[in-house]
Amino acid sequence: MNTPEDSTLGREVAYPSGYDPSLLFPIPRAAGRQAIGLTGDLPFIGRDRWHAYELSWLDAQGKPCVATATLHVPCDSPSLIESKSLKLYLNSLNATRFNSAEAVRTRIATDLSTRAGADVAVEFGLPPIDAVGEGESIDALDLSIDDYGPPNAAYLCAHAQPVVEEVLTSALLKSNCPVTGQPDWASVTLRYRGAPIDREGLLRYLVSFRDHAEFHEQCVERIFNDVLTQCAPQWLVVEARYTRRGGLDINPLRSSASVPTPLSIFRDLRQ
């Protein structure tokens, strides 16, 4: 079984000179889920949406082409794709000739689907930037914080008040790569219906990820599971939009199956 320590993270590697799908490094999701007590049926649906900013290949005549792309990896795939391996794989296309852009899209989708173990959707282009911002930020709350990890779900609670439906946001989520220790920065959005979630407790909880080492996808699943367990909303959506690194950013989303309408798809201003 592949582990994060087996990947190219934190290692000096030569950039590929030709197309090489074996560069893609899948990591089974099961281990990360076991760490947060998810061993049976998943309490969520969702996907990991990647934005690729540095995509290039050669056309049939050898002329370089450039593009951006959006990749959708379903969260029920057996494996996630490690980010550095995805960067190296996409770079392996740089000197490869394709007869059409559609051939490139199909090749990427096929290779990612094979490694993830489920159908991965690939489309050219990127979502628009969310210049307005959905929901209400909790970042201006005036409170003292001195707990930066590990994530502490005990901060989470809901008030015994009538049910609300609201969207809460924070730009203060930070976690760290479990292999290299590099910081991962994100804006996080929680949309839910249920008893009002205590906002101070939610902010303290999110800040308690600051020294925590875990992959992006696992952080979002931990947040979803902790909020669901501690606050018992009728339904819940959690999305984190991580900042770009190596020409890629990742946006994991986990949602209750009963959500009436999905979140709009946007990029964050920091991406």
Curated annotation (Swiss-Prot):
Catalyzes the NADPH-dependent reduction of 7-cyano-7-deazaguanine (preQ0) to 7-aminomethyl-7-deazaguanine (preQ1). One of its GO terms (biological process) is tRNA modification. Its EC number is 1.7.1.13. NADPH binds at residues 83-84, 245-246. The active site is at residues 177, 184. InterPro entries: GTP-CH-I_C/QueF (IPR043133), NADPH_dep_7-cyano-7-deazaG_red (IPR050084), QueF (IPR029500), QueF_N (IPR029139), QueF_type2 (IPR016428). The gene is queF. It is found in: Cytoplasm. The lineage of its organism: Bacteria, Pseudomonadati, Pseudomonadota, Gammaproteobacteria, Lysobacterales. It catalyses: 7-aminomethyl-7-carbaguanine + 2 NADP(+) = 7-cyano-7-deazaguanine + 2 NADPH + 3 H(+). This is NADPH-dependent 7-cyano-7-deazaguanine reductase. Belongs to the GTP cyclohydrolase I family. QueF type 2 subfamily. Pathway: tRNA modification; tRNA-queuosine biosynthesis. It is an enzyme of class 1 (oxidoreductase).
